[in-house]
């Protein structure tokens, strides 16, 4: 079976400030994130990864590069544009408080009712648009595993990964928040018997290896 390891990037300055950070916003990783990534590497040590794929956004690229360095393994790394975060439009860079004030309907739907989320007012990206760009790219990487036993690594973003992983599992759009969100520097593991969906969940949002228990705001 092919195993897919999905990692959310390390905690950033905007995460710490409570700002929305999508496909058009980026901020540096916090110093503490590098300790968390090292702990993640220790957790994953012993797994031989055939390939790693990463979002083009810098916070994800730095996470992936640091993780591979800490693993001390020559893992090929490919930038995959399909793994970028949601385009959050006008919400990019805004604080959680300001978004709740100016775009309450959009925020509620984005967080709690994905089927009702209409991002046209904020010039953002819908759940179907995100899923339709990401799923084919990920499935294609599984199809390239001729051995059928490879370990693959994907480094991406919280909101995007939560939606995409649930879609890979066959979860209806209305239920994609049923397992909650994903924490900075967490890993979620799926298993695939070839590229046909749905895949199988082995571990959701694993964080037991982190040096300190995550805060509620570290999960999205």
Language-model-detected regions and their locations in the chain:
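An N-terminal RHG(E/S)-centered segment typical of histidine phosphatases
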Residues: 1-49, 65, 69-73, 101, ...
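Short beta-strand scaffold positions
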Residues: 54-55, 132, 155-156
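GST superfamily/GST-like fold recognition
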Residues: 158-162
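Acidic, low-complexity terminal tails and accessory targeting/binding regions
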Residues: 2, 73, 88-98, 143-150, ...
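Short glycine/proline- and acidic residue-enriched helix-loop micro-motifs
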Residues: 108-129
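Beta-strand elements within well-structured catalytic alpha/beta cores of enzymes
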Residues: 3-7, 78, 150-156
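Phosphate-coordination/substrate-recognition cap region in phosphate-metabolizing enzymes
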Residues: 39-108
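Amphipathic, non-transmembrane alpha-helical scaffold segments
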Residues: 34, 57, 100, 127-135
């Amino acid at each position: 079976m092919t195993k897919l390891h999905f990692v959310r990037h390390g905690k950033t300055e905007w995460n710490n400030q409570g700002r929305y950070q999508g496909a058009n916003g980026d901020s540096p990783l916090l110093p503490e994130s590098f300790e968390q990534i090292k702990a993640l590497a220790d957790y994953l040590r012993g797994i031989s990864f055939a390939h790693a794929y990463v979002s083009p956004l810098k916070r994800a690229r730095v996470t992936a590069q640091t993780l591979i360095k800490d693993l001390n393994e020559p893992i090929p790394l490919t930038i995959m544009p399909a793994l970028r975060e949601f385009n959050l439009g006008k919400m990019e860079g805004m604080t959680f408080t300001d978004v709740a004030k100016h775009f309450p309907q959009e925020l509620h739907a984005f967080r709690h009712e994905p089927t009702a989320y209409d991002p046209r007012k904020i010039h953002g990206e819908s759940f179907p648009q995100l899923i339709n760009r990401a799923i084919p790219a990920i499935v294609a990487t599984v199809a390239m595993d001729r051995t059928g036993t490879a370990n693959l690594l994907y480094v991406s973003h919280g909101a995007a990964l939560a939606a995409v992983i649930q879609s890979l599992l066959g979860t209806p759009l209305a239920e994609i928040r049923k397992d909650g969100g994903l924490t900075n520097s967490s890993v979620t593991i799926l298993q695939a018997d070839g590229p046909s969906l749905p895949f199988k969940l082995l571990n959701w949002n694993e964080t037991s290896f982190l040096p300190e228990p995550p805060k509620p705001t570290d999960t999205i």
